[in-house]
Amino acid sequence: MNTRSARPDGKIQKGLFHTPFWLAPEKDIFASRAVRFKELAQEDSSGWSGYLSLLSVICEAQQAAFNRHTFPLPPLYRGQTVLPAAAEVPDGFLTVFTDLLNATDGQTNAAVTAETAKLKALTAAEATALARRILTQQTEPPDRTAEIWVQAALQVVWTAWAAQLSEDDVPTAENSDRIFCPCCGTEAVGSVILIRSDLTGFRYMHCPLCNSRWNALRAKCPTCGDAGGMRLQQVEEKSVPHLAPAYSAAHAESCESCHTYRKLYRQDKQQYADPVADDLATLGLDIAVGEAGYERGGANPFLLIGT
């Protein structure tokens, strides 16, 4: 197995107006997401708000685990990614998994409490096997409701690893292959157009596992690379009464060539838009675009279809 250090000899040459290809996750990413989930739950008038509130609690627990534990970097791989998501279950997984289950005690309803009790009863070998099935996308029907906590624990570990890297550590992807995270290889859940002073107007894809971001040209479809058939679609308030505020920033970036779409969020419309959290608060957009014949690109680890 080829590995390399976290600080290679070859550095990216950065000019005065350098636009970083890759952005490491913020150290308070889970705390910020917890606040966003709480806001979205308050804005939601349906029964879905309870699930958004649960995810806020889980994100708070993620931040606590992120702050509490140390996650030494594993050997970094050469090639298209440096921290491949399909690798073995990380050493810190069981500790974080237990932390998250314990942190939700007393903050959830009876159904969730019953589910976490089942997960707490798993042996270390059973929990590790469950995580391995989820990492390798070989889940079984009984695994579905457990995925929330497993995915949340895996996010903490991979995010902690990614936060220790710099742009120099991460391979630059070709323009034709920018739907997959160059850090861990996970497909982007969506993208965000930033309003950060030095990066205003730039589109960055967002990884749902390691929470890093990487630049992709706005003029091209991130899935097939075509630049001729891109459309931005949106659910407008005039067509849907009492539309949740999150929809103001959410767009479906659809492609007439490959008939896929991926969600994009404009921070100039909602400065706290989070591609993981806001995705779950704007599912009406997915329904509308799906009914128009487009296939979604990018999975959200917290969107459990069919459960």
Question: Language-model segments: which ranges?
Answer:
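Cys/His-clustered metal-coordination modules, chiefly Zn-binding fingers
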Residues: 162-289
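N-terminal alpha-helical interaction blocks
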Residues: 13-169
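Short N-terminal helix-initiation segments at or just after the protein's N-terminus
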Residues: 121, 146-154, 190-195, 303, ...
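Hydrophobic, glycine-enriched assembly/anchoring segments
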Residues: 277-307
